[in-house]
Amino acid sequence: MIKILKYGEVKNAELFARVEPTVRVEDVVSDIIRNVRERGDAALYEYAERFDRAKLSSLAVTEEEMDEAVASVDPKFIEILEKAAKNIRKFHEKQVRNSFIINDDETPGVVMGQKVIPVDRAGLYVPGGTAAYPSTVLMDAIPAKIAGVREVVMVTPPNKEGKVNPVILAAARVAGIDRIFKTGGAQAVAALAYGTESVPRVDKIVGPGNAYVAEAKRQVYGVVSIDMIAGPSEILIVADGGSNARHVAADLLSQAEHDKLASAVLVTDSMALAEAVSEEIERQIPLLERAEIARASIDDNGKIIVATDLRVAIDIANEIAPEHLELCVDAPFDYLDSIRHAGSIFMGRNCPEALGDYFAGPNHTLPTSGTARFSSPLSVDDFVKKTQYTYFTREALEKVAYDVEYFAKQEGLTAHARSAVVRLEDDQ
């Protein structure tokens, strides 16, 4: 049963406790990465047979496989994927940053600018395992495409027949992914980071995964850019006494069913609501297909915190910095400016977090484990880099060269100082 805690009556360590990983996978992942670097495709084939029970003849998904998979998917689901993709594009197109140039009368003879350039190739990791996530395909690929990435590559584990889940491939076609490979786990991350005979090396790796995938991303960071190292799913709901307990419980369970390590937290100013939500959770869990997972998540990591008022509840939310934050209150926009740390915010009583997972438009790849204090959701920005340029005429250089020389000497860098003025000496 979910714990009910009164704010001010328990230690902060209990209020703000987070799940810590108990499995140490660094050495195993390091060995996998080394093997893929040294043996390339051969290692990927072996890992597919070992971990996925799949004996593959090819790592790449062919167009024929794509056509067959898409044809097998319910047309209604294809239509829903296309609607969701439209919403995701609409939101992310607003994130596009433009290059700029500064060339004005204040600094005649000087041109400065910034170029926004997409990475050449992005790699998307899409999990397999206990659930298929076509939503991840859309959320990760569409921003990359909007950014202008030349080639978007997807990796995902096959089933034991050597096939990729058809709904994953359908989403890949809707999103416009260029190439798909049947490989998962740490070995897939290694292949994207270093390249193999089949899998091309990428510049950016994005997408969620298990502890092995997260550790692999951590280890290859620096060789390649990554989006984030994601932890277990989280939801925090701030709800007042007027909230519907059945709705709040359903929203908490929507995250609890993800993973036994997932965290579902309610912060409310109403003990009556706290007790009603606790009862609703107990009533709803047996109705879930993933009841065992949700039960473990709620019992081990779930909590209800009863605060003195909603402003204190907001303070608690900021301290926890959750991945998903729901504001189930009257006039939610009155509280929006007070929210400083959250991956994504869902406003009002009619905005369940599931809208954001699938359909609304904002990205669902979000910072977890409190990293919303300094990190952001996946966006178009993740797939671009910025470079800058400077141009000076001779006349413009003459105006500043001796200031630059003096500055450089203060740092003891005499070659810098000399470089600033040597051109002016040519005419002397």
How would you name each of these model-derived features?
Residues 139-150, 173-175, 193-199, 217-219, ...:
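Alpha-helix C-terminal capping segments
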Residues 1-120:
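N-terminal Rossmann-like NAD(P)+-binding subdomain of aldehyde/semialdehyde dehydrogenases
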Residues 100, 105-170:
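Conserved small-residue-rich beta-alpha loop and adjacent elements
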Residues 176-254, 258-263:
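Conserved NAD(P)+-binding/catalytic subdomain of aldehyde/semialdehyde dehydrogenases
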Residues 228-300, 304:
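A conserved active-site cap/scaffold subdomain adjacent to cofactor or substrate pockets
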Residues 150-160, 264-270, 277, 348:
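Short internal beta-strands
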Residues 318-428:
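C-terminal core of ALDH-fold dehydrogenases
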